[in-house]
Amino acid sequence: MSSLVMGCTQHKTDMPRQLVKALPQYPAYAAANYIKGRVDVKFDIGADGTVTRIEFIRSEPHHLFDEQVVKAMAKWRFEKDRPRKGVKKTFIFSPSAP
């Protein structure tokens, strides 16, 4: 079994409340090979409360976890009518010991 530890860095003080949150799946290849990773993203929150324009700032190992991060963030929902730009988030992937 693998676990996902998530840290968050927010540089906006008046963030809309997050209503729906989904965690990224741990990729099977990474879990089977006990690969750790980190993904830092910057994204916007649209007026409709959805996540838009995800930009990868850092991804280690390169692109291994990106797809799962995008899939999870596509499910996120925030309060409507409170758009924000340049919100930062860090995902830390750490496999469980065998």
Predicted regions span which residues?
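Short, acidic, Ser/Thr-enriched surface-loop or helix-capping motifs
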Residues: I45-G46
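A short acidic/small-residue loop/turn micro-motif
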Residues: A28, R58-H63
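C-terminal motif of bacterial Sec signal peptides marking the signal peptidase cleavage site
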Residues: V5-G7
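Short proline/glycine- and basic residue-enriched helix-capping loop/turn segments at helix->loop/beta transitions
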Residues: T9-K42, E67-P98
